[in-house]
Amino acid sequence: MARYDRAITVFSPDGHLFQVEYALEAVRKGNAAVGVRGTDTVVLAVEKKSTPKLQDSRSARKIVSLDNHIALACAGLKADARVLINKARIECQSHRLTLEDPVTVEYITRYIAGLQQKYTQSGGVRPFGLSTLIVGFDPYTRIPALYQTDPSGTFSAWKANATGRNSNSIREFLEKNYKESAGQETVKLAIRALLEVVESGGKNIEVAVMTREEGVLKQLEEEEIDIIVAEIEAEKAAAEAAKKGPAKET
């Protein structure tokens, strides 16, 4: 095995950092996650595995709050996510204590991306095997925001995006169907996008919503998700029926 394949700080002859690419592969194998930014709403939707009957499903949440006005979802290694989330939460608290102001969504995104980048060039560590979607409202302007970070430390702002398993298919769906909307329509779009790759319907979907009016993260209950999924399926059936046109009389 070549030296540049073992060490995270050594480039290969063609300019690759293989450990970073391996971390990106861990992301591609992770459960799908979708983020959508509306005019007054931000939504995170994540594919989740079925939990055993005896497991407390609350302990397997994939969408978490970093601060009152910021939430994060990720695809990749759960243990890596726990470490990164704890560091980000401490930074949010430290910022409040030091400056007496909450962080902006961009600030904490830069912090998380900086941590991820640092772990690509430091000895004795490896890159974080996860990609994050970060949503929230700026505490000063109340403008909604959606950012993505990846294991290399790159971050970017989006209107809608996906990461994890089948993210390319979900992204294509979002590109075709995204319209800047508000409220429930934003939630529906996120769930519709995830249903493109989740075959078992609403029971394997986790959804969290934050609105400008309430300003805090709300995790949707399974019953609420089922209602929205039923609405989406009814709309899809009506659209297909309209395409076929009225039945011909014999």
Curated annotation (Swiss-Prot):
The record's account of tissue expression is: Expressed in roots, leaves and flowers.
- Where is this gene product found? Cytoplasm; Nucleus
Q: Name one Pfam family in it.
A: Proteasome_A_N
Xref: InterPro entries: Ntn_hydrolases_N (IPR029055), Proteasome_alpha (IPR050115), Proteasome_alpha-type (IPR023332), Proteasome_asu_N (IPR000426), Proteasome_sua/b (IPR001353)
Question: Chief subcellular site?
Answer: cytoplasm
Conditions for induction: During cell proliferation.
Signal sequence interval, chain numbering: none
The superkingdom listed in its UniProt entry is Eukaryota
Q: Which SMART domains match?
A: Proteasome_A_N (SM00948)
Q: One GO biological process from the UniProt record?
A: ubiquitin-dependent protein catabolic process
Tell me which CDD domains the record gives: proteasome_alpha_type_7
One annotated Gene Ontology cellular component of this protein: proteasome core complex, alpha-subunit complex
The annotated crosslink position for Glycyl lysine isopeptide (Lys-Gly) (interchain with G-Cter in ubiquitin) is K62
Keywords of this entry: Cytoplasm, Isopeptide bond, Nucleus, Proteasome, Ubl conjugation
Q: Family, per the entry?
A: Belongs to the peptidase T1A family.
Query: What does the annotation say about its assembly with partners?
Result: Component of the 20S core complex of the 26S proteasome. The 26S proteasome is composed of a core protease (CP), known as the 20S proteasome, capped at one or both ends by the 19S regulatory particle (RP/PA700). The 20S proteasome core is composed of 28 subunits that are arranged in four stacked rings, resulting in a barrel-shaped structure. The two end rings are each formed by seven alpha subunits, and the two central rings are each formed by seven beta subunits. The catalytic chamber with the active sites is on the inside of the barrel.
Q: Could you tell me which PANTHER family the record lists for this protein?
A: PROTEASOME SUBUNIT ALPHA/BETA (PTHR11599)
Q: What does this protein do?
A: The proteasome is a multicatalytic proteinase complex which is characterized by its ability to cleave peptides with Arg, Phe, Tyr, Leu, and Glu adjacent to the leaving group at neutral or slightly basic pH. The proteasome has an ATP-dependent proteolytic activity. Mediates the association of the SCF(TIR1) E3 ubiquitin ligase complex with the proteasome.
Q: What is this protein called?
A: Proteasome subunit alpha type-7-A
Q: Which gene encodes it?
A: PAD1
